[in-house]
């Protein structure tokens, strides 16, 4: 296989949100879509071709492993990598939900109802009238979904007309608010809860360092683990804001509606998120790392300079961490390529990076946090937690079957809602009755 064939195959057969260098697409609700890497030659999800740094087209370690593996053992190889992808997603999702639940259980600020509401939920719920409360929750959901659809369309138009600087500025402003203002609120309430004395200059210095490092890691360059940690933290902070300011019934209806919208936006031929995916595939552009959690490094350096021919090679190198432009490199590019030398194993791991939208982290945590805040029972909270992980496993299973970008919310949120209401209305009364009569099963 020569260089041109390898490049043509990887361009024509790449999937949305697949590899670190492959384009994935931003969305307003931070793209509730996820995907696994797939083989660029055989379209199997088991192994991925690793291109050499010189662009010679030699087979990578996984290709050699597959070549030496009988057909009967390919399924075992696929399952091995599939299990690794499950673990790579379970750990960050679990950490995000644990942070939210621990905060809900310890900091009363996020469970107290102050009467304030988000601008997206203008209708007040009346607890004395079930019908009116249900109607207002549905109206709040319609307003919320309408805002999401409108902002997604704006994002599609901006991306279609290559307004990358505007999108990047939009994301930077959002990150600034989360990393500075919301973090300041969070630390202040935590210090009040645990009676930690701290003066404002010291607190501001902590917030400043925390926010600046986060902005650099998310929007420029930084260690992979640190970038992942910041993405988990901002997802947890956003989920806590939703838990505090969303009305109770509106929150449950919004969770169900956002799952349906996610299904339509990703899978419909004219869905906005699918259009974004297809546009990014055609342009061969990287994703905005502020919108997704990636198990492989994603950098956004020089994306706005799309007309510069040298920027394409630079994006290829920075997107995968080890990628260099295929073919003959100029003397100007050679020192830059030599600055980042990684082994083939690290290259393979970054190619096989799993990506999950931050919106999925947020709404998973909202569901578990609402269960912990309203139910107050650990059985209900753990049931929702297990339901979300089961739904995530099934989504990954479907991903391995269909080999294309899939919405990550519908299955997990549906299972979570079913487990919550069944546990809260059936299991908890049953357990309380057993405890009251001192029955042991």
Swiss-Prot record:
Gene Ontology molecular function terms on file: aspartic endopeptidase activity, intramembrane cleaving
Keyword vocabulary terms for this entry: Endoplasmic reticulum, Golgi apparatus, Hydrolase, Membrane, Notch signaling pathway, Protease, Transmembrane, Transmembrane helix
One GO term (biological process): somite development
InterPro entries: Peptidase_A22A (IPR001108), Preselin/SPP (IPR006639), Presenilin_C (IPR042524)
Main localization (coarse): endoplasmic reticulum
Subunit structure comment from the entry: Homodimer. Component of the gamma-secretase complex, a complex composed of a presenilin homodimer (PSEN1 or PSEN2), nicastrin, APH1 and PEN2.
Miscellaneous: While the protein appears only from 6 hours of development, the transcript is maternally derived and ubiquitously expressed during early embryonic development, suggesting that its translation is strictly regulated.
Protein name as it appears in the record: Presenilin-2
Native source species: Danio rerio (Zebrafish)
Gene (UniProt): psen2
